[in-house]
């Protein structure tokens, strides 16, 4: 039976893992979350998330510094990676993979996890890593370019560090960045270089709510309205426009 692929669909995914703090300790996937996105409308079509029980529960902290963080108790009765591997493979294989810093982290962890259970890892039809992408195209407007900083820059709230919440935030960040770049390319004499924040950058150790206090080049919530207005205009003008054609107008944002 041939494996079904979806080369034009985008799957945003994110992994939550333990943080190795001992020599010889490895990463273990503790949570997987993904959304499948329509490339024409940039809308969520399907979602899936699951906690995952590692083989060694001692790698998971008993307590979490976050109110909704992952603790040992939460993963004790969760399925193993092998239990959910088929579902994860079906979501990822043959689609365009998207995420923040996925080339260096999430993609590697997925391959390791499938290798550990002796099964073939899913393969992407393409990869969109928003960290490198936005660092190159959007510059350092949001400081250190972490997802928390980008979300704060656009007034999208505080990053929760839970897989499904993070991928949805990732999609919204890309929409906002693409809108800004599209407008700058359309009206370069009026907008380009004038939307940057001040040169005063918060230190990486400051909390997300402090980052959110950074002076913004627009009133809170106004960019979200502008984003929707631009999407509506594009929809009316080019109802069948795909993600790729939108990006081509935004300095080839995705490549």
From Swiss-Prot:
Tell me, what is one Gene Ontology molecular-function annotation carried by this entry? metal ion binding
User: Where expressed (tissue)?
Assistant: Expressed in the sieve elements and phloem pole pericycle cells.
Superkingdom of source: Eukaryota
Query: Which cofactors, if any, are listed as required?
Result: Mg(2+)
Parts of the chain that traverse the membrane: none
Residues annotated as binding Mg(2+) 2 are: 14
Its main subcellular localisation, reduced to a broad class, is: nucleus
Mind telling me which SMART domains this protein's record contains?
A: EXOIII (SM00479)
Q: Which residues bind Mg(2+) 1?
A: 14, 16, 166
Q: Tell me, what does this protein do in biology?
A: Probable exonuclease required for enuclation of sieve elements.
Protein name, entry field: Protein NEN4
Q: Which species does the entry assign this protein to? A: Arabidopsis thaliana
- What gene codes for this chain? NEN4
